[in-house]
Amino acid sequence: VSLIRKRSAGQNTLKTHVISVMGSCGERDRGKRPMMGEIVDKHTDLMILTNEDPYGEDPWQIINEVAKGIKHKIENENFWKIMDRREAIRKALALARPGDVVIVTGKGAEENMMVGNEKIPWNDKRVILEELSTSDSRD
């Protein structure tokens, strides 16, 4: 919330772009999903919707419910739906230019992603560092 406030206050002078990677957890707060999409839509320049702990829900359904709140972006132009979370992070990092801010939300310091009843090893920080390292070697 504080980042959003700072972003709104400096909207005219801020020369950076804010790029978000976000999802929504399955099996809870379905009614909040479009609201989450709307908030991120209003306060970021580019956004990527992705998978985040779907539990037993269809992850595409979750992504599409979040997308219902997006009114100011055009799919595949400044907003994307990418199921694979690593691919979503990779896309965000590829879009970023010097001075831009990439925000990856949802998983925080969690070490697993819940898919059905299965815990899949996952750590956003590790994946981000791996992708940055890989992109540095490609440049």
Locations of the language-model features?
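ATP-dependent carboxylate-amine ligase
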Residues: 1-139
